[in-house]
Structures are given as structure tokens and as C-alpha cells.
């Protein structure tokens, strides 16, 4: 993420606790100041898995508070591990500006999440995934940031020790970024679903 950075700023601020590790590594690599510009209440759970938008928005307000002394009149690089619906990012960016930040540049330590993870817990449908429905510029405008950049797919692989992604046999289950599911999700195939189910039935008969 740091190697792909193209923004100059005063401080690096993580979204606690999800962005802590990425923000620390980012700041160390670029020799920037790492600051806790957001203070987290650890007695409030993860907001993106709450059942409704209203509750998620309230959860952000209860969970995080801006450290005005740290961020006032500063150009900030705000780092989080992911951006799903955009609820948390929008609220946090607004919170930082309300506390006096001069600029807020958002960096996400993974590629755009464009596809549901059917192997996950309470994963949103595709229509709820912000990156599946908006361009980078549109997402940036939606969350109110000065700029927005996601880690590239190859950048993700390089960050954990691979030279590049193996296009034929990916080293990771990265289907939520690429749509390249290990097993094609039948209920998402539309008109092709009946054909797929028929083939599955024939396969089972011959087992």
C-alpha cells in the first residue's frame, strides 16, 4: 500500500482496530508520523455486520471519537483494512473533517470488494457492495474524501510474499475481489442456472 502511495500528508491515522497494522506498516515504510487520530470504544461490536443501516450508523458514532488535538489542521492519510458498504468510511471521514482535518485521503489495504463471499458470515449481496456499483471516483465522492485508493490485486499478493497472482490457480481465495469463485455459485447464474443444475444431476447419477 505504501509503495503504491501517491499522496503527501502530515500524518497516518488508522481506523481502529481494523486498520492498525496496515497503517503502522505504511507509516514506517514512508517514514511518516503514525497517530491515533481516532479513539475506539472497545465495548461496541463490528458495525458492518449489524442488521440495518440505521443501527450501523449509530454504531459508528458510539464506537469512534476523533482526537481533535491530533488531527486539527492536518492532512491525513486514513487507512482501513477494507471498504464494504461505505457506512463506516463515510461517517469517519465526516468525523475527521468536523474535528478540523484539512484533508482526508483514504487508503484501503485490500482491493475493491465487488463480489459476495458465499463462504463468509453475513456477507452483503452484490447490490449492497459499494465497489460493485460505483467507480473509484464515485465512491470517493460518496464517502466525502479528498482522494481514495485501494491496494491493487497484485499489490495484495506481493505484500504477503508472492511475486504475482497465478491467474490459472490463484494462491488465495480472492473471489470477493475478482469474481473467480472456486465453485461457481449456481444461484447467481441467472438463465444459466437450470443448465448447471441439470449437469449437476447427471454428474450425481454417474457417481
Language model segments and positions:
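PRPP-associated nucleotide enzymes
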Residues: 1-204
